[in-house]
Amino acid sequence: MESWIFLGLILLIAYLGKNSSLLIAGAVVIVIKLFPFLSQKLYPVIQAKGINWGVTIISVAILIPIATGQIQFKDLINAMKTPAGWIAVVCGILVAILSKHGVNLLSSTPQVTVALVIGTIIGVVFLKGVAAGPVIAAGITYYLVTLLNLSFS
C-alpha cells in the first residue's frame, strides 16, 4: 500500500509542478503495477535496462542534427577553436565518468536511490530541472562518498 501512496504523491507533485516527463513516468509505472503479471516481468527488465534505453534515446536525439546536416564538421572544428568548446569537451568527459560510477552505485547500493529520487523530484518540479540527473547525481555521490570515506550502511 505504501508504494501506491508514494507513487500517487509523485504523480501529484509532477502534476502540480507541471512536469510532464515525471507525470508520464509515474503513470506508466502505476499502470504496469495494476497488472501483477506484467509488473513481475517488466519491472526487473526496465530497472536493469531502462537507464541504458534512456541514454540511447538521448543519444539518438543528439545525433539527429548531424543526420539532418544542421551540424557539420566545420561546426566541430569551429567549436574546438574556442575555450567554451574545450570546456564542453571536458564536461562531456567528466559527465561520462561520473555516469559510469553513478550506474554502478545505483546497482550496488539501492538505498541511495530513494535519496536521489527525492533530490531529483525536488530539482525537476521546483527548480524546473530535467530528470536526466539521477545517474550523474549518483556519480557525484560516489565520488563524494569515496572522497570523504563514508558508507551507506
Swiss-Prot record:
Keywords: Cell membrane, Membrane, Transmembrane, Transmembrane helix. Pfam families: DUF441 (PF04284). The keyword Cell membrane applies. It is a multi-pass membrane protein. GO terms for cellular component: plasma membrane. The chain crosses the membrane at residues 4-24, 26-46, 51-71, 86-106, 116-136. It is found in: Cell membrane. The keyword Lipoprotein does not apply. Belongs to the UPF0756 family. PANTHER family: UPF0756 MEMBRANE PROTEIN YEAL. This is UPF0756 membrane protein LSL_0936.
